[in-house]
Swiss-Prot record:
This is Protein Vpx. One of its GO terms (biological process) is viral life cycle. Its main location: virion. A motif (Nuclear localization signal) lies at residues 64-71. GO terms for cellular component: host cell nucleus; virion component. It comes from the Viruses. Interacts with the P6 region of unprocessed GAG. Interacts with host VPRBP/DCAF1, leading to change substrate specificity of the CUL4A-DDB1 E3 ligase complex. Interacts with host NUP153. Belongs to the lentivirus VPX protein family. Keywords: AIDS, Host nucleus, Host-virus interaction, Inhibition of host innate immune response by virus, Viral immunoevasion, Virion. Plays a role in nuclear translocation of the viral pre-integration complex (PIC), thus is required for the virus to infect non-dividing cells. Targets specific host proteins for degradation by the 26S proteasome. Acts by associating with the cellular CUL4A-DDB1 E3 ligase complex through direct interaction with host VPRPB/DCAF-1. This change in the E3 ligase substrate specificity results in the degradation of host SAMHD1. In turn, SAMHD1 depletion allows viral replication in host myeloid cells by preventing SAMHD1-mediated hydrolysis of intracellular dNTPs necessary for reverse transcription.
């Protein structure tokens, strides 16, 4: 038996760069919609703004790379939130948590 990881169906390496960018955009939009129900809006916007300031403006990385780094940070934040035993939807948020009102738009540059 070959111990190497098998390529899942549909991931033959023939995907285009455009499909990867589309995946990134879709994933970011979905993550932001979920995150707003679990993390303070201010935190979401600050993570985006700090990511943009550091990766895009200071380091000169591409917009896609900046979005990818933001995605990584937000995934870690959500993982920690859930690992601590998320009770947001069941018990509601405590101070500094979810704010009432309609969900905010995605961070600048992600719409």
């Amino acid at each position: 038996m070959d111990p190497r990881e098998r390529v899942p169906p549909g991931n033959s390496g023939e995907e285009t760069v455009g499909e990867a960018f589309e995946w990134l955009e879709t994933t970011l939009e979905h993550l932001n919609r979920v995150a707003v129900n679990h993390l303070p809006r201010e935190l979401i916007f600050q993570v985006w703004q700090k990511s943009w300031a550091y990766w895009r403006e200071e380091q000169g990385m591409s917009i896609s790379y900046t979005k990818y780094r933001y995605l990584c940070l937000m995934q870690k934040a959500m993982f920690i939130h859930f690992a601590k035993g998320c009770g947001c939807l069941r018990e509601g948020h405590g101070p500094g948590g979810w704010r009432s009102g309609p969900p905010p738009p995605p961070p600048p540059g992600l719409a």
